Regions:
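Phosphate/NTP-binding elements of NTP-utilizing enzymes
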Residues: 1-176
Length: 176
């Protein structure tokens, strides 16, 4: 698996503060780590079963030539829009998973942080994001699935939105 943080410093920090602590603190994980010292460093973690975890940053050297079944891009809107003149992070990352065909997966997470490119844009369909770059642009490239809930009273499905959720506001909080 390849996990790509937004910078080299953040990749190092994530590895040392999160992963290394978890690996040391969990006996179950620790026994699965390779016993050879040179197999595990700040950016590379090797396990006894042969699996490999790479912690990288947006760079063509990191995001080229190696195949990964799973790639995760964190805080995507803080990535450069064009990585080393080779393209956007998602395109480069998803290319790493093509060897695994439908078993490969590219996960991207971020808070939207890019400006909308066309201030006069109007939605043409209910499942459409405005023209922009970053994580919001990936929504339009995907299959645009949304989560729908079943109404407990009539069984009809609806998209959860504040204006569609009625009838609960005057009820006491059952979790207090």
């Amino acid at each position: 698996m390849l996990v790509v943080q937004m910078t080299e410093d953040k990749a190092r920090e994530h590895s040392k503060k999160r992963l290394d602590r978890t690996f040391r603190s969990s006996a179950a994980v620790k026994k699965r780590m390779s016993p050879r010292r040179n197999d595990n460093n700040v950016h590379d973690k090797t396990f006894r079963d042969g699996s490999f975890l790479k912690i990288g940053w947006p760079s063509v050297n990191i995001m080229s030539s190696s195949d990964y079944r799973f790639v995760a891009l964190t805080d995507y809107d803080r990535f450069p829009e064009n990585i080393d003149s080779e393209g956007d992070g998602f395109s480069l990352a998803s290319k790493r998973t093509t060897t695994f065909m439908s078993a490969g997966m590219t996960l991207v997470e971020s808070s939207p942080g890019r400006d909308i490119c066309d201030s006069k844009w109007r939605r043409k369909s209910p499942h459409e994001a405005p023209p922009t770059t970053g994580i919001l642009s990936l929504y339009n490239r995907g299959d645009r699935r949304r989560w729908y809930w079943s109404c407990p009273h009539c069984g009809e499905y609806f998209q959860p939105a504040m204006d569609a959720m009625t009838g609960y506001r005057n009820e006491p909080d059952p979790f207090k």
